[in-house]
Amino acid sequence: NLGRIESTNPCGEQPLLPFESCNLGSINLSKMVADKDGQPYIDYDKLSQTVKLAVRFLDDVIEVNQFPLPEITEMTKNTRKIGLGVMGFADMLIQLGNPYDTEQGLVLAEEIAHFISEEADKASMELAQERGVFPAFQESIYDTPDGPRFRNASRTTIAPTGSLSIIANCSSGIEPLFALSYVRHILEGEEFIEVNPYFEDIAKNRGFYSQDLMKQLAEGKRLKDVEEVPEEIKRLFVSAHDISPEWHVKMQAAFQKFTDSAVSKTVNFPHGATPEDVAKVYMLAYEEGLKGITIYRDSSRCLLYTSPSPRDQREHRVCRLLLEKRGGGGGGGGGGGGGGGGGGGG
């Protein structure tokens, strides 16, 4: 027993013992879809090789990293915990033609999480044969006559990848799409409009693309309210705010079932959500076996990094009070929900 878990990393998906560090990496699932005779499928051979390489890479990171304190170096190398996760899950579902909030979506989530977990375990056991088990192995739950011999005390964690997914140009973590066309707020008050590339391609191929449509969506119009878009496309490109909180929890639970540490996931609530609504989701998360959960109520912050409705001038009491305190005047608060924000803890 190395002690009690005392904290998590900032987004809560990695439980940490005193002086442990957080060593995470994420596989872009949108790159794991192949096509045969016009039929998309998950390329599990490619995914298997990617998992094996990623586990080795993360173990190498522990070895070459220069930690700020000797205590961190000691604890990190004692357990050698890594956290391999995913991003681009929503993009994968879109390529497969499967809406996010469906039973088939949950089946795919469990299937992928299970596969990655098994492949990560195999890769860590191979590393143990090559480099040895983690030093604290004899004090661990794996120290049994027939127990697995791992190089890393834990192998999988699902992070939100809010910034990483921007670099990789894919959907964040296991989140659904936040919006199809939206304004992204960056440094020094600048902003720019982004359009989901899969939606843009389908819109052009199906003949309903227009700059005006992209502008309307960026200004907050919901896809379900656009008449010229076919119903099956509306269903496929469901966004975070169109998915019920219960479905958000179900999807997180599907991944948590096969994840060593925790899963970071935002449950988006409408602005009018009540404390009872939130309590219901907390209880559902507990019943589903989640290790933590994050909720976000629409427009409960003054400014978000991504907003599907930049012109929404809804009265925002918290922002108004802050502005009055600073000598500013009343104020509106545009915005939408988390979309890649933090998630469940340990």
Where are these regions (language model features)?
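Conserved small/polar residues in nucleotide/adenosyl-binding loops
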Residues: Y305-D312, K325, G329-G346
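Function-dense linear segments that define catalytic or interfacial modules
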Residues: N1-T76, G88-M92, C170-S171, E175-P197, ...
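Core alpha/beta catalytic barrel or barrel-like domain that forms the active/cofactor pocket
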Residues: L16-V33, A54-E71, I82-L96, Y100, ...
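A glycine-rich phosphate-binding loop feature that marks nucleotide/adenosyl-phosphate handling sites
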Residues: N1, E71-I82, L106-E111, F134-R149, ...
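N-terminal leader/propeptide and maturation segments of large enzyme subunits in energy/redox metabolism
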Residues: K31-S48, F57, T76-S117, E191, ...
